[in-house]
Swiss-Prot record:
Membrane topology, as annotated: Peripheral membrane protein
Location(s) in or outside the cell: Cell inner membrane
One of the protein's GO biological processes: photosynthesis, light reaction
Gene coding for it: ndhH1
Family note: Belongs to the complex I 49 kDa subunit family.
HAMAP family, per the entry: NDH1_NuoD
The protein's role, per its UniProt record: NDH-1 shuttles electrons from an unknown electron donor, via FMN and iron-sulfur (Fe-S) centers, to quinones in the respiratory and/or the photosynthetic chain. The immediate electron acceptor for the enzyme in this species is believed to be plastoquinone. Couples the redox reaction to proton translocation, and thus conserves the redox energy in a proton gradient. Cyanobacterial NDH-1 also plays a role in inorganic carbon-concentration.
The protein, known as: NAD(P)H-quinone oxidoreductase subunit H 1
GO cellular component: plasma membrane
GO molecular function: NAD binding; oxidoreductase activity, acting on NAD(P)H, quinone or similar compound as acceptor; quinone binding
Amino acid sequence: MSMLETRAERMVINLGPHHPSMHGVLRLIVTLDGENVVDCVPVLGYLHRSMEKIAESRTIIQYLPYVTRWDYLATMFTEAITVNAPEQLAGVQVPRRARYIRVIMLELSRIASHLLWLGPFMADIGATSPFFYIFREREMIYDLFEAATGMRMMHNYFRVGGVAVDLPYGWVDKARDFCNYLPPKIDEYERLITNNPIFRGRVEGLGYIGREDAINWGLSGPMLRASGVNWDLRKVDHYEIYDELDWNVAWDTGGDTLARYVVRIQEMRESVKMIRQALDQLPGGPYENLEAQRLSGGPKSEWNGFDYQFIGKKSSPTFKMPRGEHYVRVEAPKGELGVYLIGDDSTFPWRWKIRPPGFINLAVLPKLVQGTKLADLMAILGSVDIIMGEVDR
């Protein structure tokens, strides 16, 4: 009886760009040896929209609605970096109340982004129940955003020198209620997920990257901190009012998919702590624009003093960026989001270079998945947290 001959050729398959677990229009060309992944090549560009070139023919206020389409699940961060770059280049002072409001919005956006990461990530590995619980809390954050900004996702809220409008009456109390509501729900997620033997069997030891490799690849955010690197730009760069708040950097030494999950869960808890403190310490004063009140009151207006006239003044729509260059970065939910800005005494930037965290984090994917099973590729990709809007720009 003759033995059946098996084919030793490798198989090349396409995943995406419309596969449900691709998190957007990502395409992966995967080389398989049986069920084992031999190679994986990400193919980008399906969502490229010339975001950097568009910036060169727009004022900052005109460009703000565009930037919410980079990482469309954490739009407060793309707005923050867009106004921080010209503010630091031109030395614009931001009132304390506006800085506190910004931090509250940024941390709410971080929680919303991590929640929307956790739901699809669990669905990718076959657990659909947590998805529905997680979206329940995410909707509450979007309700807070809608009350403050008028928009649920694309907020267009940040401005050079502050924010667009002050917080509405009763908003602070609603935000406090949410901060009391969320921690027990995070405990509920952990009871459902963290020690679930099926979950741990799917993610433990999977997609490992060590400390040195994480640094050498230029990883940032939860991808870097899950590999044992205690590095958070909110502590390193001292921007906004993070130094005035008591909080800890969430990090882990596991370096695998489970560690990245643990770091993001810890970050949600720390964000709640920060929001609570910022709400309690929220100062009075201008949020951005006292110019209208000063003009309506005439030359004897109480708003006519030096501080209010200049520090609390709304920037002009034709705000000119001085000649010079500057790199600004913030700690976004997915890592270091940066902008390299070159100004030339014009209302338009001469160069606007975006440093998206997802693009750099995606580069390490072939290394993470090499030698794993095809079914594990989705879990590893989900743990990286890719949003193609910011990858392709």
